[in-house]
Swiss-Prot record:
Protein's name in the database: Growth hormone variant
UniProt-annotated glycosylation sites, renumbered to this chain: 166
Expression sites by tissue: Expressed in the placenta.
Pfam families the UniProt entry points to: Hormone_1
Major location category of this protein: secreted
Chain ranges passing through the membrane: none
Cellular compartments per GO CC: extracellular space
Keyword Nucleotide-binding included in the entry's annotation: no
Gene3D superfamilies, alphabetized: 1.20.1250.10
Modified residue annotations for Phosphoserine: 132, 176
Paired cysteines (S-S): 79-191, 208-215
Organism: Pan troglodytes
């Protein structure tokens, strides 16, 4: 084959393949509905782990008298994450914008990255499926990333690193009036369950507002 013919053939082949190459090199945009589905799955998994571990621990170690005393005492039942401003009822929650609810959810998730590792022994002795400090920490980090992605998509698309929760649990723990390790772990599990319930609720509201046909799930 002549050199000129070979060059023409290669050029024609390249032109035919160009649209496919361009399409393959482009990064497809993940649908917003899928991003919310992924975030909700992670949030629900975290809440279920928190709820099941809390129930298991309470039934195994906490007497009814201890439970009532714990819940009625504002010093023992105070959660360190309550320093994060969150809406206190349904009406106030509905008044928050989507981005506000996502930011609150992000701060709640970030607030648990340190203290959840203090529950290592509790998770290690738990019979709840998937309950280990490494699994829970990974779920928290995955959801943190998922919420940051949702904030990026719902805002203006500009890159953002997300606000980092600054108050450390260790500072709160030094002020704790609970010297009993058993009750201290119970208090952490109580707060963890409470906060993961908030996160799942806030994400569900934002999903309902943002994705058609997603309400009621």
């Amino acid at each position: 084959m002549a050199a000129g013919s070979r060059t023409s053939l290669l050029l024609a082949f390249g032109l035919l393949c160009l649209p496919w190459l361009q399409e393959g090199s482009a990064f497809p945009t993940i649908p917003l509905s899928r991003l919310f589905d992924n975030a909700m799955l992670r949030a629900h998994r975290l809440y279920q782990l928190a709820y099941d571990t809390y129930q298991e621990f309470e039934e195994a170690y906490i007497l009814k008298e201890q439970k009532y005393s714990f819940l009625q005492n504002p010093q023992t039942s105070l959660c360190f994450s309550e320093s994060i401003p969150t809406p206190s009822n349904r009406v106030k929650t509905q008044q928050k914008s989507n981005l506000e609810l996502l930011r609150i959810s992000l701060l709640l998730i970030q607030s648990w990255l340190e203290p959840v590792q203090l529950l290592r022994s509790v998770f290690a002795n738990s019979l709840v499926y998937g309950a280990s400090d490494s699994n829970v920490y990974r779920h928290l980090k995955d959801l943190e990333e998922g919420i940051q992605t949702l904030m990026w998509r719902l805002e203006d698309g500009s890159p953002r690193t997300g606000q980092i929760f600054n108050q450390s649990y260790s500072k709160f723990d030094t002020k704790s009036h609970n010297d009993d390790a058993l009750l201290k772990n119970y208090g952490l599990l109580y707060c963890f369950r409470k906060d993961m319930d908030k996160v799942e609720t806030f994400l569900r509201i934002v999903q309902c507002r943002s994705v058609e046909g997603s309400c009621g799930f």
